[in-house]
């Protein structure tokens, strides 16, 4: 009885945390976007077996009509996104570089309007949406110091590393954090600042 109760509580906690993880994502092109974001560590959820409940796969239709299957933390993030966030993300991309696992273990799915990334494919790993001007700046190839460089690396393979938050907004400034820095975009001045 005690073990069954613990399992039910653990599954409920994991579900609640998964729903909280996605609060506050916004599209840089929208003037009526939400003003806050919440980051919650999935490590806080636990079940009696020590692992999070399995995440149900999500199937989407790409622009070319093919089916794209999201799994693990990418599926959890997409499933918990608001309808506005899903609309802003748009259709999933297909083809080379559109989805997969990077050399550093980061899992990702590119969309017309953004990307969802997670540090690894474990179901309990939080995933984040990066989009707009911040996504564009994150994808710029950079050297280890963060300066743009033709022979550098961009995105999660670059010096900023993987996303560690959804976009937050304070006034006209939107910010996304990464393992080794942050990117801000001011919608009033159109200025992007990268800090590594």
Sequence positions of predicted segments:
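Extended, compositionally biased repeat/scaffold regions that form elongated interaction surfaces
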Residues: 4-11, 15-196
